[in-house]
Amino acid sequence: MENTDAIQVSSFPLPPAQYYKLYTDENVRNNRAPKPPAPIQGTYQMFGQQFSTEDNIIRPLEAQGFKRLYPQHFDRRKELKKLNHSLLVNFLDLIDLLVHNPDSPQRAEKIEDLNLLFVHIHHLLNEFRPHQARETLRVMMELQKRQRQETTQRFQNHLEKVREMVNNAFASLPDPAESDRLNSTVEPMDTGDDGEAGKSRGEGCHPLDRLMCELVDKM
C-alpha cells in the first residue's frame, strides 16, 4: 500500500515502456502503432493532485487558498524584486532565530512566511508564461521568415546567373548575315558516279549544319 501511494505522488512519471515496445519504427512504418488517447474531459490527476479541464491554466491565488500579498493591478517586475528582497530578509530572520532561540514559536511563522513568498514568486513567474510563449512564437516565425527570404534570394541569384549564361550563349552565336554569306559560298562536291546521290543529300542538309561544317573546315 505504501509503494502504491509513493507511485501516485511521485514527482516523476514511470518509464514510458509503451513507447519503445509499441511505437517501434516497424510498427509506425506499417501503421500498427496505437492511436493517441482522446483528450481528457472533466478531472484528471497529476503529481498526486486533482485538476479539472475547465479550470484556468493559471488559477488565481485566492482559488488556491493563498492570501494575496500584492494588489490586483501592479508592476510585475517591481513586485518580483520586492518579493525577492522580502524572501532574503525573512530567511535571515529565520537564521537568526535558529541561532539565538531555536525553540521560538516564531520559527514556524517564518517558515510559513517563506512558503507564502515562494508561492507568490512562482505565481508571478507563471503569469509570464503566456507572454513567453508569444515571444517564442514570434522569434520562431521571424526565423522562418528570414530563412525563406534567404532561400528566395539564393533562387534569385541562380536565376540571374542562368539569364547571364543564356545571354552570353546568344551573344556568341554568329551573325545571320554572316551565316547567309557562308551558305552562299558552299559549293556541291563532285562525287563522280554518286553525284546525284550526293546532290540529293546536300539538298536535304540544314543550312546551320553546312555552316558548322564550314567552320570546322576552317579550323
UniProtKB/Swiss-Prot annotation:
Segments for region (Disordered): 173-203
Pfam families xref list: Med7 (PF05983)
MF GO annotations: transcription coregulator activity
Cellular compartment(s): Nucleus
Domain of life of the organism encoding this protein: Eukaryota
Listed GO biological process terms: regulation of transcription by RNA polymerase II
Record has Transport as a keyword: no
Keywords: Activator, Nucleus, Transcription, Transcription regulation
GO CC terms of this entry: core mediator complex; mediator complex
Assembly: Component of the Mediator complex.
Family the entry assigns: Belongs to the Mediator complex subunit 7 family.
Known role: Component of the Mediator complex, a coactivator involved in the regulated transcription of nearly all RNA polymerase II-dependent genes. Mediator functions as a bridge to convey information from gene-specific regulatory proteins to the basal RNA polymerase II transcription machinery. Mediator is recruited to promoters by direct interactions with regulatory proteins and serves as a scaffold for the assembly of a functional preinitiation complex with RNA polymerase II and the general transcription factors.
Entry protein name: Mediator of RNA polymerase II transcription subunit 7
